[in-house]
Amino acid sequence: MQIFVKTLTGKTITLEVEFSDTIDNVKAKIQDKEGIPPDQQRLIFAGKQLEDGRTLADYNIQKESTLHLVLRLRGGMQIFVKTLTGKTITLEVESSDTIDNVKAKIQDKEGIPPDQQRLIFAGKQLEDGRTLADYNIQKESTLHLVLRLRGGMQIFVKTLTGKTITLEVESSDTIDNVKAKIQDKEGIPPDQQRLIFAGKQLEDGRTLADYNIQKESTLHLVLRLRGGMQIFVKTLTGKTITLEVESSDTIDNVKAKIQDKEGIPPDQQRLIFAGKQLEDGRTLADYNIQKESTLHLVLRLRGGMQIFVKTLTGKTITLEVESSDTIDNVKAKIQDKEGIPPDQQRLIFAGKQLEDGRTLADYNIQKESTLHLVLRLRGGL
């Protein structure tokens, strides 16, 4: 489908997109056409700023919709970075900048490689993937820069091909940091790396010191082949299902695979691993679920409660739901019964339009409550 992107100069750009495209994808297409880096783009639709990881479908953006492009002006605010020598560096940043971005700016000014920088604010070491906003760092805040001394120690990483890579690290480096260094040297994305030491797979958030990895230790690097692992899912009846998955699969994906094999709708599935219920948007890697791990499948019993959904034609649909069901789940059940795609559904209760990520409990919707279904007409406003 085509959508339009209108800039503040009044120029309109036409893009070829799909409902399943993420906002990141759209920004990349704008970069291809206009040369504007994604991190300088803010996209607005229906008065809302669009988040990178969400899809066009999530925002009900349909063919010939118009998005508005606002540029993030560089230099939203100034912050200061104080070094141990007492020197103060001034940086132009935005609240949405990540700590990585800030370290890159320091490198531009001072020539200090990011992997030698540790930034401290309010007594806390700042993590690369987080933003200034996450740490409540505001204009004219002062960060403290501590240097990681080079040559803390060397370690070796041996690949399955027999190649050995030498890395400069410190005991306080996390496994994430080590994977990033391997990426810098070898170009292998961190999410395709598995590091093994003393027969144990190393977890991203832990440090080398946590695993007692010392100078000249050798780690083993195993690549995660795309599609390369099997996991098991055990049901309460004792049946075990085998699934082909990737570490990057989300829990939603896994539930869809179980539905394909067993016919159990995802909204009736609860997956448990290491005693924890798994959340739909997270990945297997997030939970450190590895090959041949076993998940436990618990069914949400139907009949938690009944609610009614009344359409504009006067028809009333009865649904079996639970208080913990999200509005997305309810729309999926309506789709199952009536064939109406969720992105064409608007649900109203007590005069309020219900938001997808919220639960029935959030809106105090109880058994035998009646919701009202209004259709969004395709191609309408």
Curated annotation (Swiss-Prot):
Glycyl lysine isopeptide (Gly-Lys) (interchain with K-? in acceptor proteins) cross-link, chain position(s): 76
GO biological process: modification-dependent protein catabolic process; protein ubiquitination
Glycyl lysine isopeptide (Lys-Gly) (interchain with G-Cter in ubiquitin) crosslink site(s): 48, 63
Family as reported in the entry's similarity comment: Belongs to the ubiquitin family.
Further information: Ubiquitin is generally synthesized as a polyubiquitin precursor with tandem head to tail repeats. Often, there is one to three additional amino acids after the last repeat, removed in the mature protein. Alternatively, ubiquitin extension protein is synthesized as a single copy of ubiquitin fused to a ribosomal protein (either eL40 or eS31) or to an ubiquitin-related protein (either RUB1 or RUB2). Following translation, extension protein is cleaved from ubiquitin.
Function as written in the Swiss-Prot or TrEMBL entry: Ubiquitin exists either covalently attached to another protein, or free (unanchored). When covalently bound, it is conjugated to target proteins via an isopeptide bond either as a monomer (monoubiquitin), a polymer linked via different Lys residues of the ubiquitin (polyubiquitin chains) or a linear polymer linked via the initiator Met of the ubiquitin (linear polyubiquitin chains).
Protein name (database record): Polyubiquitin 3
